[in-house]
């Protein structure tokens, strides 16, 4: 247990140069509200409602730092042309009384985009692209030093564009099987140079990205890293590795770590803490690929949700570092949130709970509610593909008309 005084979850907290009014973060979740690669008015409505409902910092998910860095068509992309739409989003959040973070990312070989500047999707190592089973892109390309330099520049520029757009923080996505995670994970990184082998070597490139972002915006914005504490797969990083990763990111100067888990392809249930309904799966037209994916699904364990399902792993990180940490993973009651604070975590990040109840934080603060209505069914994930974008199935669907309109239009 933590020996420090236990703060109230409703008390302010300092993250780098940023002061949050309380300790609640809306975790990044792909909302499907970015037609044409820019925020829609529905996305502005959602994030404004989240902070109006009490959340101190809301996170806009999956902002690609380049066209090559996209995973999905119509994914949010930070560029000069998209800035007016991002500004409309940040202005809406600020007017609603909250702060907003841009999650900046590069998909690497986890991509459904065939148009790119390289022959194959980039990754830590080349060869067979197992995550390409979902997209039909079966080969990936090993990054060389020039590729790394370009991606580092892209992340730094993405952070500067986020600052110009009015964001208060940037969250570097280092987990879940995207590019930086592909370097960190021994499942993906088979290099034999200074960027492969030991965990220290596998962190070398992600640390360079973090350093470039800190140098670019770290004096004006909070710089956050989200990563998978445990990958939940036999050949992947464990929580003990996750604790070492945290030490290195702390040493490099990150202002906050958001502690997640799992990988999109190998261990999605580790990430979400519960099984996925059949309708949540990507539908594949190629019969051979569809068969391979069906076989993979049959081997997945059935996982029943339990609150704070990642706490055992996150404790190992808390014991390893002194820096601020945000716990993510199954907090859906006041009792769980208070336990997180008592365990020494500085903030709590929530995704599904806040999609179900945008005003859950205010309900907790006023005493109107203790337990979330969220059932952890994971159907909100599939809702990102509907015309109105992500929403909880217990509520009304998102506004399809607003979701067709660019935020800055």
Residue ranges, per PLM feature:
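Flavin-dependent oxidoreductase catalytic cores
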Residues: 1-409
